[in-house]
Amino acid sequence: MEDKFSNRNTSIEFLRLWFMLLIVLIHAYCHGSGLNYEYLYSLGSDWSTAHHLGLLCIGKCGVTGFMFISGYYGVSLKWNKLASMIAMLLFYVLLLTCFGGYSVSDMLKIIFHPWDEWWFVSSYMVICFLSPLLNQGISALGKRQFGITIIGLLFYEYVGKFISQDNSHDTMFLLTIYLCARYIRMYIAPPDIPTINIKTYRNR
């Protein structure tokens, strides 16, 4: 389904780049400093070390923000885009194997079971594969049904995981953010947001 809101606001594109930078910085902070996520979560229990957890939370806003923008404008299944993502994944796997101290078994795990360390790439690809089904389903649902679905997903992701103390992010988390953004774009955001067609602008 072609999104009728395909024109992009250049300010939003810069915001997307900012969210990507936050994602890179938080990974550099966690992995570059040798700290794991479980240890960073434990630092929040003491005010003297809580700022470390605060930095982690700010970085995680990059994941939510990036996926929100993707959902706001819509994701479509494009094989060339998926091929580029897979090629990028294989490139970084090769770099980590050659220079990052990863073994061959680690490399195979990343390629064939990338849901742990590389969860975002895997989850985003799943949403790309599901996008035709998602777009058709959203079109078939009314505003009320779509809203009830969003409320249920938000309850599961935030209330349910808060109760279970599960801090993980997964495909369901990205899907929830994606659908929330679609709902806001369809039913809440004003339809006359000024936009610039970036492709047309570049061809001038």
What kind of feature is each model-predicted range?
Residues L154-Y158:
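Membrane-interface alpha helices of multi-pass inner-membrane proteins
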Residues D170-R204:
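Aromatic-anchored, glycine/proline-accented short structural segments
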